[in-house]
């Protein structure tokens, strides 16, 4: 009749959620995402590092329910570009999401379908509201794992294909020791 409430332990230091489904994304899983393809290939052939891990607690895909997940985004760069998550729109575009930074330093890159972009820096305690219709990607700009918690509608779904095809209109790089958000020369609108 009623769904059972659920309580789980989240380790804020490691990002692990007990009993959660784990997804691991290596650099080899992100072919075509980084601008410097030669450096990407060298890194994949040499070590194929883990870029990020997701620990997800998912419900049935139905309206009114919520999923939550932590992501551990490791430090690193491909060329000048900081490590980032693949990024996505929601399959149901009118669904929002909330991110809460737990550890480390990074930010959220957001964009509309037309490519209008926003950058929101994140550190522990930062809460980011991702409005409906905005694609979003997190970026680790620090030198330790960037860990955050995401809460989103169970029926939101993920559209990774649009970002895989078009990319984001901006990229986040390190230049002269500073974090810079610059135009992506490969952006396809």
Swiss-Prot record:
- For this UniProt entry, which residues form the secretion signal? none
Example GO biological process: glycolytic process
What are its cofactors?
Answer: Fe cation
EC code(s) of this entry: 5.3.1.9
GO MF annotation, one: glucose-6-phosphate isomerase activity
InterPro entries xref list: G6P_isomerase_archaea/bacteria (IPR016758), G6P_isomerase_prok (IPR010551), GPI/OXD (IPR051610), RmlC-like_jellyroll (IPR014710), RmlC_Cupin_sf (IPR011051)
State what protein this is by name. Answer: Glucose-6-phosphate isomerase
């Amino acid at each position: 009749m009623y769904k059972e409430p659920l309580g789980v332990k989240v380790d804020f230091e490691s990002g692990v959620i007990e009993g959660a489904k784990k997804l691991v994304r290596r650099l080899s899983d992100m072919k075509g995402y980084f601008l410097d393809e030669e450096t990407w290939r060298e890194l994949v052939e040499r070590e194929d590092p883990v870029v990020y891990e997701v620990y997800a607690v998912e419900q049935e895909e139905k309206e009114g329910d919520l999923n939550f997940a932590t992501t551990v985004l490791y430090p690193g760069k491909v060329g000048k570009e900081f490590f980032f998550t693949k990024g996505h729109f929601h399959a149901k575009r009118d669904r929002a999401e909330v991110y809460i930074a737990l550890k480390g330093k990074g930010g959220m890159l957001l964009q509309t379908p037309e490519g209008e972009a926003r950058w929101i820096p994140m550190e522990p305690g930062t809460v980011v509201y991702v409005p409906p219709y905005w694609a979003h990607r997190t970026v680790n700009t620090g030198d330790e794992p960037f860990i955050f918690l995401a809460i989103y509608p169970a029926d939101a779904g993920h559209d990774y294909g649009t970002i895989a095809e078009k990319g984001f209109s901006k990229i986040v790089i390190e230049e002269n020791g500073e974090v810079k958000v610059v135009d992506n020369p490969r952006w396809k609108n």
